[in-house]
Design a protein with these regions (language model features):
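Hydrophobic beta-sheet segments that form the core/acyl-binding groove
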Residues: 130-173, 266-300
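Generic structural detector for well-ordered beta-strands
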Residues: 133-135, 183-185, 210-213, 272
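A broad, structure-centric signal for solvent-exposed, well-ordered loop/edge residues
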Residues: 141-143, 189-192, 220, 238-240, ...
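Flexible glycine-rich active-site/ligand-binding loops centered on an Asp-His dyad
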Residues: 165-172, 176-192
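Well-ordered beta-strand positions in beta-sheet-rich domains
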Residues: 179-183, 210, 270, 303-306
């Protein structure tokens, strides 16, 4: 367990580092061993560990990947941090409701623990968040108590490398009330035989608003979310990774668009991150019906859609 011995106990263990119940091979999407956490992991040491291990990773779609499901029970939201997140993303503040994207923030430290581990086959450095699909089955109270579960669902070949899918679930009791699938891409040399999701072809969406993004938006989002990836913080740290300036967090761009669009209480959200947004900068939020985009000139940075779940009351758009 290494650095995590103080915040982790595997189900079925004796509390002294025993093996998790049910450990062994498991197929994608099946139940693997569960590791129960007593608190959310700290992101900074995970980022450091993942960075140090990255040069030794040899990514491939056929690689083994961790089957463990990390579980954090008894989760309650820090309302001050939530308010800071709502302000930086443009959501209403002070309501007893979680923004549709906020459970991703809660689950991200658990995902990082998996992706920074020795048994995760892809290098954390250079791993690109390419898309997210979120399903919220009902409105989530900010004052509620939840159980959070995160696991790696599988690897897939991509013409530019290898993709990994990471699943996050939020439960109340036995019921899944929110879930997401995030895809991340590790770029490496391939035979270009891997698949890539086909994008829906449609004309440009009508512009709704022009947003001038300040140079500190990455630092403000990092303070609210805990995601302090250096590419988002300052031009000097971004240049170390090949960017001329700091870039906006992909999940900030998605959250900002969804705050502007609004979402039904029971909703399916899809967002694809297509190009980085350099900071400071000016972008156009465009939308038509269910679809939305964030554009800079002729370049689409983010595209996505908001879809009411069938069989649920679509009245009363919330964020």
């Amino acid at each position: 367990m290494g650095m995590y011995a103080d915040d982790t106990q595997a189900e079925g263990s004796n509390g002294e580092g025993g093996r998790a119940a049910g450990s062994g091979s498991a197929g994608p999407g099946s139940d693997g061993p569960r590791t129960v956490l007593t608190r959310s992991p700290s992101l900074v040491p995970l980022l450091a560990a993942g960075a140090l291990r990255s040069p030794f990773k040899r990514p491939a779609a056929t690689s083994a990947f961790p089957r463990t499901r990390l579980v954090l029970p008894g989760l309650r939201v820090d309302l001050a941090r939530l308010a800071a997140y709502e302000r930086v993303c443009g959501f209403p503040t002070g309501e007893d409701a979680l923004p549709v994207t906020y459970p991703h923030v809660l689950g991200f430290p658990l995902a990082m623990r998996l992706m920074s581990g020795r048994d995760f086959p892809l290098p954390l450095l250079g791993l690109v968040h390419t898309s997210i699909e979120i399903t919220r089955y009902r409105e989530l109270a900010a004052s509620g108590e939840y159980e959070l579960t995160v696991h790696v669902d599988g690897l897939a070949p991509h013409r530019r490398g290898t993709e990994v899918a990471v699943v996050t679930e939020l439960r109340v009791g036995e019921d899944v009330v929110w879930e997401s699938v995030s895809t991340y891409l590790a770029r490496h040399r391939t035979e270009k035989t891997g698949g890539e999701r086909e994008r829906e072809k449609h004309g440009p969406l009508p512009g709704v608003a022009e947003w001038r993004l300040a140079g500190d938006i990455g630092r403000r989002y990092a303070a609210a979310s805990g995601d302090r990836n250096p590419i988002h913080l300052h031009p000097l740290t971004a240049r170390l990774f090949g960017f001329k300036r700091a870039i906006a967090h992909g999940m900030w761009t998605a959250a900002r668009c969804l705050a502007a669009h609004g979402t039904p209480q029971a909703v399916l959200v899809r967002a694809e991150f297509r190009a980085p947004v350099l900071l400071p900068g000016t972008v156009t939020y465009a939308a038509d019906g269910e679809r939305f985009e964030l554009c800079g000139g002729d370049r689409v940075h983010v595209s996505g859609g908001v879809y009411a779940l069938p069989g649920h009351d679509p009245e009363g758009a919330v964020s």
